[in-house]
């Protein structure tokens, strides 16, 4: 390794595991845990019986499917049941979802393995060994998490196997009833059908199937799919339209009270003193609590004072009226300018962790003066808030040694653990109901709001309490997408060929903070998210180095939709355009040259460019190509500039996500990702001054409005490859695509987000 620290073998392995939250130290490498049957019963109602840990069946033939992932608009309540319905040969309408119990069989193995810091082209023994170990550890940890665009990817095998096994058990039960061979039976539309025409409905076979020994369990081939790969309507849409869908904020346990909080305006500040005498006389106010005394350390929950009242309005008005003196603490002078200055200083002094290298960059740089052209650029990205439509909320009741919890969470396991920790009860005494989420985007991976509401409910005399943060609370007390500073340098020969490519960036590390807040583990090791999308890109240069410097962050950091890809794609795809311009080449042709060994990437790029066609007069097309979460996305943004206003009219989005389980939700996620990413590209910025977040609501943290949203055209390329992620991959390319179009129109290279002229 030249020009950057070479990681030791041990550090590399442990660092890779650290970013996934799975630390191998102390774990034995045990045989793979069977994912078909767990240690907890599938929660079924009425006459339902469980055929395995994932699938149950009622006498009326309805199928119950365990749902270990949270529905937050990405369509898992449709896509995951499709996997079971396909293998069981039942219509999707016959399947209902039930909340999966906290059990290791539902752990998200794919997300943890995807967090390892290896290049996609790496076929070495270290990668295969570490991936194998992580798979073992992940099975034992059983972390039930919705994130990393991994829901379908992780469920692809276990849920299909659960469905196929259930079908085989039903066939065995029917064969026994008829005293026939299972080989002479087939299944169709919820029935087992014998070759002679006899048939039995699944419901009639349910009880006997429980004890039936399945014969051969065979998964369908793609050629046999009737549901998978065919567009299916979202099953959660009707309830969201008619208002019957239950989100966290809709929880209404009997006798529920409401809580509003005041938290320190300065990051890390504490409560000094509170004068609540007048507040206690206000209408509906039941209690004022400083919950810090019952809140354990390292839960991520912000210190503050809560008002418990009969309505949220009463609680909020009383909270605003409280006289609180704050102890601001050591961060009262913190500013965005100081944070970026610290990044720059660290980049000047430290070599950083080298994620990828090829050739000899030191030799290239030493000869840079003799080459045709040398290029340097510095890019930056700000902190970002999540701004989910449903504000942060959670409902809890602490009574008789138990905790009842209603939570719109992406991390059910963490929610149960922190609730038990705060309440001082065993985890098995926590009863969790996971509601729908009005947007997650990574914010609800953290469980600080769970810790906060349980602490408040512990002081509420047994009443259930619903905690609601206002938009201002949410914006000023988020766990933010890290700010980042990246430096690029490259050398080109007289023919425009890139001789060397170097990228060195600096930012905080999400995993270090997340591990402390949610696992109680000390920070350490590399964090793949800091360099993802850059070190693992598919552009190849003979001499290349990608490194990152972790700078400890006082600002709370959290996972944000597409995580490090959200800024690294902007940096990388913008600089690739700079290289194309410096080489005197068309930006698309330049990319094609670099992707000569990657036909799937080329196909995606070509599909987007062909569909986009020529830009109309007065507009320009900007192009970006990026792979994240296993999915390749190319976007062409059609942009105009009027004065200082950047307007995006149309976006063509081409996708290769492997086998498209439900093309309908894939297209929806592409549209959603474009708009989400465009909001960040044009408007998103959280700034710090005097230790405080300056933004508070949509007036100063705007998102794309309906009249600003572009037309989005989605192309899904056919593929038989393993399904990959789709919840996030459409987010990263939009910012560089727009920036590259602006350069064509104005000749001005925009290297900072949000994009401004």
Task: Describe the function of each predicted region.
Residues 2-757:
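Cofactor-binding beta-sheet edge motifs in enzyme active sites
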């Amino acid at each position: 390794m030249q020009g950057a620290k070479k990681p030791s073998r041990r550090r590399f392995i442990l660092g890779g595991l650290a970013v996934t939250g799975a630390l191998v130290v102390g774990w034995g490498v045990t045989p793979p845990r069977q994912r078909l049957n767990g240690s907890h019963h599938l929660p079924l109602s009425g006459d339902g019986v469980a055929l395995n840990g994932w699938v149950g069946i009622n006498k009326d033939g309805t199928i119950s499917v365990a749902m270990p992932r949270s529905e937050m608009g990405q369509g898992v309540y449709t896509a995951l049941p499709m996997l079971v319905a396909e293998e069981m040969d039942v219509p999707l309408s016959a399947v209902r979802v039930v909340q999966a119990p906290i059990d290791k069989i539902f752990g998200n193995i794919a997300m943890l393995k995807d967090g390892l810091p290896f290049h996609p082209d790496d076929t070495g023994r270290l990668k295969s060994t570490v991936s194998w170990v992580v798979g073992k550890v992940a099975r034992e940890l059983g972390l039930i998490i919705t994130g990393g665009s991994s829901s379908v990817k992780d469920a692809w095998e276990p849920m299909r196997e659960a469905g196929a096994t259930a079908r085989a058990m039903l066939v065995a039960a029917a064969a026994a009833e008829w005293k026939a061979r299972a080989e002479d039976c087939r299944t169709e539309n919820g029935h087992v059908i014998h070759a002679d025409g006899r048939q039995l409905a699944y419901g009639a076979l349910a009880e006997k199937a429980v004890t039936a020994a399945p014969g051969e369990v065979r998964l369908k081939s793609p050629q046999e799919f009737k549901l998978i790969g065919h567009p299916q309507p979202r099953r959660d849409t009707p309830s969201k339209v008619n208002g019957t869908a239950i989100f966290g904020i809709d929880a209404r346990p009997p006798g529920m009270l409401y809580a509003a909080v005041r938290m320190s305006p300065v990051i890390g500040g504490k409560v000094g003193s509170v004068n609540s005498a007048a507040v206690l006389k206000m209408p509906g106010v039941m209690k004022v609590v400083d919950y810090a005394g019952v809140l354990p350390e390292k839960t991520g929950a912000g210190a503050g004072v809560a008002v418990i009242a009969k309505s949220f309005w009463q609680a909020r008005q009383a909270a605003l009226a409280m006289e609180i003196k704050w102890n601001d603490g050591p961060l009262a002078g913190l500013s965005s300018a100081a944070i970026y200055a610290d990044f720059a200083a660290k980049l000047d002094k430290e070599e950083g962790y080298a994620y990828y290298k090829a050739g000899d960059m030191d030799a290239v740089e030493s000869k840079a003066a003799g080459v045709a052209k040398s290029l340097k650029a510095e890019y930056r990205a700000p902190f970002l808030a999540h701004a989910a439509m449903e504000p942060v909320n959670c409902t809890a009741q602490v009574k008789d040694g138990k905790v009842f919890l209603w939570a719109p969470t992406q991390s059910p396991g963490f929610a149960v653990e922190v609730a038990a920790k705060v309440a001082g009860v065993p985890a098995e005494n926590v009863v969790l109901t996971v509601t729908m989420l009005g947007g997650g985007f990574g914010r609800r991976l953290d469980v600080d709001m769970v810790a906060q509401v349980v602490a408040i409910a512990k002081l509420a005399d047994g009443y259930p309490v619903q905690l609601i943060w206002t938009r201002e609370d949410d914006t000023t007390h988020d766990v933010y997408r890290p700010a980042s500073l990246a430096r690029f340098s490259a050398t080109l020969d007289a023919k425009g060929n890139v001789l060397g490519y170097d990228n060195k960036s600096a930012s905080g590390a999400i995993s270090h903070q997340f591990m402390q807040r949610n696992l109680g583990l000390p920070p350490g090791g590399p964090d793949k998210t800091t360099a993802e999308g850059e070190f693992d890109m598919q552009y190849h240069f003979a001499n290349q180095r990608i490194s990152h410097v972790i700078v400890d962050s006082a600002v709370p950091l959290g996972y944000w939709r597409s995580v490090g890809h959200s800024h690294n794609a902007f940096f990388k795809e913008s600089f690739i355009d700079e290289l194309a311009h410096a080489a005197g080449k068309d930006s698309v042709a330049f990319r094609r040259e670099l992707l000569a060994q990657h036909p799937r990437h080329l196909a995606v790029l070509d599909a987007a460019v062909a569909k986009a066609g020529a830009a109309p007069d007065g507009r320009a097309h900007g192009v970006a190509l990026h792979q994240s979460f296993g999915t390749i996305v190319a976007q062409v943004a059609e942009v105009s500039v009027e004065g200082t206003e950047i307007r995006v009219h149309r976006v063509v989005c081409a996708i290769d996500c492997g086998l498209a389980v439900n093309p309908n939700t894939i297209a929806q996620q592409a549209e959603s990702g474009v708009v989400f990413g465009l909001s960040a590209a044009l408007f998103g910025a959280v700034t710090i001054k005097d230790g405080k977040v300056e933004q508070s609501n949509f007036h100063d943290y705007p998102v794309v409005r309906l009249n600003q949203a572009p037309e989005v055209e989605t192309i899904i390329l056919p593929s038989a490859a393993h399904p990959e992620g789709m919840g996030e991959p459409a987010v990263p390319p939009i910012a560089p695509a727009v920036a590259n179009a602006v350069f064509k129109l104005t000749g001005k290279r925009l290297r900072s987000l949000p994009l401004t002229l």
